[in-house]
Amino acid sequence: MFTLKKSLLLLFFLGTISLSLCEEERDADEDEGEMTEEEVKRSVLGTVKDLLIGAGKSAAQSVLTALSCKLSNSC
């Protein structure tokens, strides 16, 4: 059982190294100045996500403020 685990771990490790080398080679082939379509999508989605998180935080803060006001009867 232990030898099976060792061999599977070795195959996983070698596959990971092979995959990372392929990715590095592919990245080296692409132009450095150009943004790929995936990078553009990631940046747009990241911006939208940040905006939604900010809006959610402000909405939650206003709800919590209103609740604390109602609970303490200090409105």
From Swiss-Prot:
<keyword id="KW-0165">Cleavage on pair of basic residues</keyword>
<dbReference type="Pfam" id="PF08023">
    <property type="entry name" value="Antimicrobial_2"/>
</dbReference>
<dbReference type="InterPro" id="IPR004275">
    <property type="entry name" value="Frog_antimicrobial_propeptide"/>
</dbReference>
<keyword id="KW-0878">Amphibian defense peptide</keyword>
<keyword id="KW-1015">Disulfide bond</keyword>
<dbReference type="GO" id="GO:0005576">
    <property type="term" value="C:extracellular region"/>
</dbReference>
<dbReference type="Pfam" id="PF03032">
    <property type="entry name" value="FSAP_sig_propep"/>
</dbReference>
<keyword id="KW-0964">Secreted</keyword>
<keyword id="KW-0732">Signal</keyword>
<dbReference type="InterPro" id="IPR012521">
    <property type="entry name" value="Antimicrobial_frog_2"/>
</dbReference>
<dbReference type="GO" id="GO:0050830">
    <property type="term" value="P:defense response to Gram-positive bacterium"/>
</dbReference>
<feature type="signal peptide">
    <location>
        <begin position="1"/>
        <end position="22"/>
    </location>
</feature>
<dbReference type="GO" id="GO:0050829">
    <property type="term" value="P:defense response to Gram-negative bacterium"/>
</dbReference>
<feature type="propeptide">
    <location>
        <begin position="23"/>
        <end position="40"/>
    </location>
</feature>
<keyword id="KW-0929">Antimicrobial</keyword>
<protein>
    <recommendedName>
        <fullName>Lividin-3</fullName>
    </recommendedName>
</protein>
<comment type="function">
    <text>Antimicrobial peptide.</text>
</comment>
<comment type="similarity">
    <text>Belongs to the frog skin active peptide (FSAP) family. Brevinin subfamily.</text>
</comment>
<feature type="disulfide bond">
    <location>
        <begin position="69"/>
        <end position="75"/>
    </location>
</feature>
